[in-house]
Structures are given as C-alpha cells and as structure tokens.
Amino acid sequence: SYGVLTARLKGNGDYPKIGWICHLDTADISLSEVVHPILVENYLEEEIKQKNGKRITTETNPELKKHIGKDILFSDGTSVLGADDKAAISIVMEAISIIMENSLEHGDIYLAFTPDEEVGLKGAKALDLSLFPVDWAYTIDCQEKGEVVWETFNAGKATVRIEGVSAHPMSSKEVLINPILVATEIISLLPEKQRPEE
C-alpha cells in the first residue's frame, strides 16, 4: 500500500534475515521533472558549466578531487540529477544480481522501496513490517564509495508560542516577561551539535 514495494530473496543458508531499504523519490526543488544529465568522462578538474549559470569547480565542491580521472554525472542545472536515491537503488539491485549469479550463501534478504522520504518519511511509515520480518535492516542511501554511515540525524517540527507579559516600565519589576529573552533561553538549551545547522 501507499506505493511501498517489498520483495524477498529466499535464503539458502542459516544466516540472519536482513533488509535493505531505499527511497524512490528525489528532492523536489521546483526544477524540471525530466532529468538532464551531463556526463563528464575522465574528469580532470575542469570547470563544469550548468545551463542555470552556475559553475561547478573543485573550489566550490572539494569532494570532486576524490574523483579525478573518473567518469562523473552532473545535472545540467535545470533538473535534479536524482542520485539520492537512484544510486542506492541501482546498488541494491546489482548486489542482488551478484548474489544470485554467483550462488552466494545468504539468509533471507528483504527489500523495501518506499516513496516520499524527502517529504517526511511517509512511505517508511506506511511500510507493513509483517512483510519485512528482518533481524537487521539497513537504509541504503547516497554516500561516497566505500562509506558506511552508522548513525543519522532525525528531524522533527514543533511550534512554540511564547506569550510575554507587558508592563509599564515603572511597574515592570517582577511582572514583565520578555518573550524574546524566553525564546533565547529555550534556544540556548538545545544541544549545540544537534541543531539543524549542524
């Protein structure tokens, strides 16, 4: 339901049941729905000019230095490339192909492809866990080659309404409540490394 696709590769050995989860959607930033990629073969630190006027360089994107000499896909600037999470989906499908083609031993492997990750994990919330009875699950997302992320941030939303108490300056002692100072105090209580900008 809700566009969630689940599948199972039946195990051929006594191993834990694992799950791989990928999201199907890409970030919607009001660009073209049609992907317009640019393939740069044998990337040699050249400047990439996008149709929207932006330029991609190793100065603005130092992570590109790790990919010198490789073929790289970029967006032309008129669309989102969508590597998050299409790259992970292709990796999962390739991993399943390799396991099957080489008759590798494995326990049950469950797959879940969910929609609407970028807009509040709606697909993940709709995942029927009775169809995903795993011992361990891994979210496969867009990372650097060889990189494993073993923790993630969680975002939440809250609306805080602070009402102050106004008072005439002469009679404000122990009566006036400045809502800006109350808000500042609340913000100061948030752990520094868990704020959205981190």
What are these regions (language model features)?
Residues 12-14, 24-28, 118-119, 145:
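A short acidic, glycine/proline-enriched capping/turn motif at secondary-structure boundaries
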Residues 32-34, 41-49, 54-57, 61-83, ...:
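Midchain, well-structured core segments that form catalytic/ion-binding scaffolds
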